[in-house]
Amino acid sequence: MTQRQGQDPRLDTSRTIRAPHGNKLRAKSWLTEAPLRMLMNNLDPDVAEHPHSLVVYGGIGRAARNWECYDKIVEVLERLEDDQTLLVQSGKPVGVFPTHKNAPRVLIANSNLVPHWANWEHFNELDKQGLMMYGQMTAGSWIYIGSQGIVQGTYETFVSVAKKHFNGDAKGRWVLTGGLGGMGGAQPLAGTMAGFSMIAVECDESRIDYRLRTGYVDQKATSLDEALAIITESDTPVSVGLLGNAADVFSELVERNITPDVVTDQTSAHDPLNGYLPQGWSMSHAAEMRLQDEAAVVKAAKKSMAVQVQAMLDLQSRGAATLDYGNNIRQMALEEGVENAFDFPGFVPAYIRPLFCEGIGPFRWAALSGDPEDIYKTDQKVKELIPDNPHLHNWLDMARERIQFQGLPARICWVGLKDRERLGQAFNEMVKNGELKAPIVIGRDHLDSGSVASPNRETEGMMDGSDAVSDWPLLNALLNTAGGATWVSLHHGGGVGMGFSQHSGMVICCDGSDDASQRIARVLHNDPATGVMRHADAGYDIAKQCAAEQGLDLPMLNEELKKLK
């Protein structure tokens, strides 16, 4: 019997999970308490999209395979010694092995399939049988911090859009987008922070209401005319969650000859079965059809995606700055016959890659104490250590003022190779001397400079043609394991869906110890350095210059790097 024919072991409406706060340990040390708390934090109802189903974000991105596996992971982390390592296979704890104190306490592999079988059809069959779990990026690797996790990256993208297309001034301009889930929900706040107004189309009213409660969206509308009136009449940037179907609304704007200034999308188009509502379907009808005829759902969803992408292309032809925001909607439309679906660029090659060349990406940390003051103190420390970056300081000020913490207090801050280790050492010292009430964990999104291969997103259009080479995230995971990250993860299919990406993650616990300081020195240098290495190897001059300045040893490039010092 499959788990969908019987009672679904992934669903338990009686559960409410929240991470412990304070200094009292359930585990034997902070090195095992840290992954325990972050796993639980991923399932906090203030953090996760559907916590009763173990779904954290991104369609069906889960923290554990089922509730039995979750309970067993918790049990093992509570008894795990500091010379043991827990292995987790697609959300299931499968082994505990002797290692050493500087090895990772947890090693995670999620959603990985042999390439020939790396598609949604095969994954869904395994998923039905309880043999796999979709880990997305930070869901199954236990370092999701709510929508804040993508706010700064989205903000940086919109700032870059304003610079490239509007001479740096977004005043009076507006963005059209779709999706207000765990990732897409960051768009309205990021957009208004960057000076744009925004209409974000969402078919699930509960998601709009959640973004209203948490301050990520300003107003709700139930018709396009109402949404347009709100942004037209406002003297300041305003965001509107519009209840509707993205394909319908995007097409209506084309028909009415209304052209936004910027067009993008963050629906869960990467997962046509679970993540995208076909035109003309209700939420309840879609839920029923997923149980009755999965193929029909996928077919209808992809057909609607094609309609939406065609509308995006039409709006682009009328002058809208149009970009793919990494959900693989262009690929889905291409498969449905929209031959020029890739005529608008992905956000990474268009706006983010120069940052990746310097190892700059979504560095994040969380306060295991649960006390917001610990985050505010680390915010100030970042300003002290990076004094000459007013853009970064402005971000930290806006984040404190406008971003509500979800679950354990956390912060996202895009910094690169030259700063990550320094910040980690400073945070560790703050724990050691008692400035912070409990240890800090430092991690990142898998969307980072050296940790992902995703030809339709992070590695789209690499200058040497190496878009699909996935050796790089494997090397990143191996190096972070060797360096002593507290937990390391290796996933497949995050962001863009099965068959289209491989990526790795790491988290390191700053517990104030000298051993932690040594691990931080290795991990928080090596991790971003792999991104600089990867881009230098692909031929990017910015990356080569950074490699030379930071003294990286890249055997095939060292002679060239000497000339750049």
From Swiss-Prot:
Its EC number is 4.2.1.49. Binds 1 NAD(+) per subunit. NAD(+) binds at residues 58-59, 136, 182-184, 202, 207, 245-246, 266-270, 276-277, 325, 495. InterPro entries: Urocanase, Urocanase-like, Urocanase_C, Urocanase_central_sf, Urocanase_CS, Urocanase_N, Urocanase_Rossmann-like, Urocanase_sf. SUPFAM superfamilies: Urocanase. One of its GO terms (molecular function) is urocanate hydratase activity. It is found in: Cytoplasm. Pathway: Amino-acid degradation; L-histidine degradation into L-glutamate; N-formimidoyl-L-glutamate from L-histidine: step 2/3. It comes from the Bacteria. Its cofactor is NAD(+). GO terms for biological process: L-histidine catabolic process to glutamate and formamide; L-histidine catabolic process to glutamate and formate. Keywords: Cytoplasm, Histidine metabolism, Lyase, NAD. It catalyses: 4-imidazolone-5-propanoate = trans-urocanate + H2O. The active site is at C413. GO terms for cellular component: cytoplasm. It holds the Pfam family Urocanase_C. PANTHER family: UROCANATE HYDRATASE (PTHR12216:SF4). Catalyzes the conversion of urocanate to 4-imidazolone-5-propionate. Belongs to the urocanase family. HAMAP family: HutU. This is Urocanate hydratase. It comes from Vibrio parahaemolyticus serotype O3:K6 (strain RIMD 2210633).
